[in-house]
Amino acid sequence: MARHGDTRSPSPVGSTYSSSRRSRRDDDRYERSRRDDGRSYRRSRSPEKRYRDRERDRDSYRRRDRSLDRRADYRDEDTYRPSRRDRSRDRRRSRDRDDDRDYRRRSRDRDFRSRRDDSRDRARRRTDDSADLKHKSRRDDSRERARDSVPRSREASKPSTPAANTGPTDDEKRAERLAKLEAWKQKQAAEKERKQREAAAAGGTRSILDEIDRKSGLSPAVGSPQSSATPIDAAPASYTGKFDPKAIAKNAAPAPAVKSVLGDDIAVPPSAKTSATFPSTKTEVQANKPSATSSKASSLKVKGNVGSFGLGTKQAADTEKASATKTLGFGEEESTRRKLERLPTPPLDDAKDSNKEEDVTAEDEDDDVDMQDGDTEEENAAAARAAAERREERLQNEARDSQSNGDVQMSDASNQKAPDKMEVDAQEEEEVDPLDAFMSELAESAPPKKTAGAKFAKAKPQQPEALFGDENDMDMTAVGDGDADDFLAIANKAKKKKDIPTVDHKKVEYEPFRKKFYTEPSDLAAMSEEEAASLRLELDGIKVRGVEVPRPVSKWSQCGLGVQTLDVIDRLGYSAPTSIQAQAIPAIMSGRDVIGVAKTGSGKTIAFLIPMFRHIKDQRPLENMEGPVGLIMTPTRELATQIHKDCKPFLKALNLRAVCAYGGAPIKDQIADLKRGAEIIVCTPGRMIDLLAANAGRVTNLRRVTYVVLDEADRMFDMGFEPQVMKILANVRPDKQTVLFSATFPRNMEALARKTLNKPVEIVVGGRSVVAPEITQIVEVRSEDKKFIRLLELLGNLYSTDENEDARALIFVERQEGADTLLRELMRKGYPCMSIHGGKDQIDRDSTIEDFKAGIFPVLIATSVAARGLDVKQLKLVVNYDAPNHLEDYVHRAGRTGRAGNTGTAVTFLTEDQERYSVDIAKALKQSGQSVPEPVQKMVDSFLEKVKAGKEKASASGFGGKGLERLDQERDAARMRERKTYKTGDEGEEEEEKEEKNEKAEEQFNKVLSSVQSAAAPSLPGVPKGIDLDGKITVHKTEKDANGSKNPLDKVGSAVADIHARLSRAGVMRSGVPIDNRGPDAGAFHATLEINDFPQKARWAVTNRTNVAKILEATGTSITTKGSFYATGKEPGPGENPKLYILVEGETELSVTNAMRELMRLLKEGTIAAADSDARAPVGGRYNVL
């Protein structure tokens, strides 16, 4: 920080910045006007031009007048002090630089250095230091020449400048500086006391670090103004900045006697702010002074520059310089204190001229102080942070060393090794290359080290991760130290289907709940049994089984419902309960388990929803993370969506919440809805299991479930769904109330369902598996090619009248491929339609159903996925384009029309080879009271005769399902264990079963290979049935053309070779395929492999560029794909290209054999993969496990 007295104007010492700035400009103008013609050259501010002029024109122009007279004119205390030192650090940075000031500053080395630091960008200061040192040395030479060359008369013409180099002037200045120094010392002592009290009061990390420093013996000499009384070595150990050649020269100059105290003086101070920011000023300024003189001045210099920003700082610096002028002979600039950019750079040549340069040295020191104080506080803060980080690192190293195997403590090592370490550092610093030093300075962004050889500075630099080593080791062990078996176990565990644990209900304490809410009205209680039977007969012939079955109701008011529920029922337009509702609602609200079987469109959904709402409202509200109370499971996603939609009118009125969870939709949304809480969940079994197993069972649970509904129960208990449904029911409390509803309920399904019920009441309305009488059923026997024409006729008749303009038509097919094909054909004929099946995305299925219900398109093509539960208004025509394969499916398909008392038509197409399905259709017609057409009856009779003769097996009702492969394997494993345990004597049968399995596997593979042969191949004698991919590979030697040979024996031999090649089993072409490898570039050996009739995946495997490139690189052969592809059953005609095949050519028989073996392996793998993908493809029209 510059003191206020440094100004050229005659203003007082305390002049302000603005007055200093103004006086300097006036002086500059005066000085410029007094220059002679030789000095009228206009100087530019650019450093390039300035350096060039200095080298070329120093003697001729004599622009740099540094004579003692001129210098003495400005040495007066009132006029010599530069005004720029009055400025604060912030104002200096933003100050304008004008030409007048530049003109003056060029005449003095001090101003030249300061202007250089201010005018350039701060980021370039360090880069230009080495170049500046070079010019500084040249400038010193010019000082001697300037003394003799400048005439004395020039100085005499300045009235404001006193005489130069007078002794009294120097004494007066020295006395004033000493007085100011004493005042500054007192102020600094008080300031340090205050800071120490604040630090002691604050405590914390700073106190701990200070204590560690004291224990380490590294307390610096800046603890007090009087702390340093020993001379300092000229080579500071803390230097890590830019390399300076003059620093090396100065390092060699000092006497070796001062090295003993170097380690004590240059150390890490306890204060981050002081030690990190100002590490090396004391050493640099006092480089070559005697120890007696430098002792006091060094301590004052360091303390003043570090801790104070006022008048005392400058006075201390002046006093120090005045005492050093008689002995310090190096007129060089010092390095900046905060950034450590420069080292003391005394030229060896100028040592003898130290007495003549003492004034210049003093001025240079003033300049150095000025530049040191010009740094920003951000740099100070950054240096302080870096010092704190180094202390943290030292603490960590101490902690690590204390836990190591007998390492010496850090404090002892640093105290013992400091002097020797410093000597090593000094030697290394002298030998360092300038480029290496510069690059290392760029690489090190942290402030320079301040340790005098302390050992902790380099303690274990390669192990910074030791702090977190335990955590990293744990992670690495978990992943990297595992065996291959662990990975296999993890992979197998991930592949397993999500499962839910079985609940032990004996260990769970469930809340009691009430089931019975129904109180029989007096008018119904007074009714006799005969009157009740007559009422059931009037209600479509209701049949009931069970003990104490309630009598059916005839009005909604008799059901014991709440006002809100009755209002919603009235708003929906339900005037009176339907047959199933009249009997099922009283039975369910009485707390009984119920099996309800009723025709399609009879209102079964409302029959189980209304009692559920009453059941839920009787229980306490849900708390956080409690599961639902009512659980409704359906077999299809569309039915789940429809039931959820039917719930919505009641949910708002009763203040309840419901969630619809089904596969295909994003599970995250369903999890979020469940976590918010829902009293009702409508779901499919597969997605329900996923939700129960998600997040270790924390998403939802079944502890609160007391009311369970299985809609379309016969399908839910079929082989496909039964394991999942039973798994879910096993996790619900045993005293739950269970309700089953369906339009069809075979006896075998009923027996299975009764195992989950407790004394159920069975309600059957209109018979089991019966089509509603409101539906007109038409069954026609037609060939496959005439069905589409008949379909167009039916659609044309439907939409021919205006009254059916808004009618809908639903067409059922057996398979997904059939649905897409029929969709394409109908759209070509101009009918707007859509298709729905299990192969489509769920969002497409949902949107298609909604659009169909809204009438956006009138025709929908669907598989049996839309056969159950779908309720569409204005649906007047159902066409079974492909006949259903069992009775229940037919009833549900036909039941999509004629709902809620409306009429409809169901048309079914049968082909002549579908005799098996005709039996169930004829049975449905008879049960619904309709006549069976004669062609259909003939088909039924023919099939029954075949059954009697044992040629056909009678079809069973129900889906039957395909079963689950995993369950079949578990049953087989259990049976095998029993056989081995009990030795039942069936071991022979076991061997026979194994042989049968092997035969089946071989037969399956032969079927795959049989698809390779052409359609006409089996009828040709002598041709193999399939290509033997594991057989012997035949490699032929390439025959060269006999140029112009007319020998008939050669032609016969060639023909015989062709015949043998065509009849070989593997590796060559079959009949009609020539071997066109007799060209000039043909290899010595060749083989062919036909791939035309293999599946597409297999052909891709052997023609893929990547696979072929690998074979070429491994074998060195040539592989060429030739021929043309022909569809299955099509043979190439005369003159056409042969079937697609691969030609392999090579120089050796072994290379061709290896290439053929690899191609056959790829072909076999591709064939098996194609067969597996076909087996995994979903079967259209079937229900899949959700």
UniProtKB/Swiss-Prot annotation:
Statement: the UniProt record of this protein carries the keyword ATP-binding: yes
User: From start to end residue, where is composition biased (Polar residues)?
Assistant: 158-168, 272-298, 402-417
Positions of region (Disordered):
1-236, 267-461, 954-1001
Determine if Hydrolase is one of this entry's keywords.
yes
- Give residue spans, biased composition: Basic and acidic residues: 24-157, 170-198, 349-359, 387-401, 963-986
Question: Which residue intervals define the domain Helicase ATP-binding in the entry?
Answer: 585-763
Q: Which reaction does it catalyse?
A: ATP + H2O = ADP + phosphate + H(+)
For this chain the motif Q motif maps to 554-582
Give the residue interval(s) assigned to the motif DEAD box.
711-714
Q: Where is the composition biased (Low complexity)?
A: 8-20, 446-461
InterPro entries according to UniProt? DEAD/DEAH_box_helicase_dom, Helicase_ATP-bd, Helicase_C-like, P-loop_NTPase, PRP5/DDX46/KHDC4_KH, RNA-helicase_DEAD-box_CS, RNA_helicase_DEAD_Q_motif
* Binding residues annotated for ATP, in chain numbering: 598-605
Identify the Gene3D superfamilies for this entry. Answer: P-loop containing nucleotide triphosphate hydrolases
Q: Which Pfam families match?
A: DEAD, Helicase_C, KH_12
- Which keywords does this Swiss-Prot/TrEMBL entry list? ATP-binding, Helicase, Hydrolase, mRNA processing, mRNA splicing, Nucleotide-binding, Nucleus
In the Enzyme Commission scheme, what number(s) does this protein have? 3.6.4.13
User: What class does this enzyme belong to in the EC scheme?
Assistant: hydrolase
Q: Which residues form the Helicase C-terminal domain?
A: 794-940
Family, according to the entry, reads as follows: Belongs to the DEAD box helicase family. DDX46/PRP5 subfamily.
Explain the purpose of this protein: ATP-dependent RNA helicase involved spliceosome assembly and in nuclear splicing. Catalyzes an ATP-dependent conformational change of U2 snRNP. Bridges U1 and U2 snRNPs and enables stable U2 snRNP association with intron RNA.
Q: List the protein's name.
A: Pre-mRNA-processing ATP-dependent RNA helicase prp5
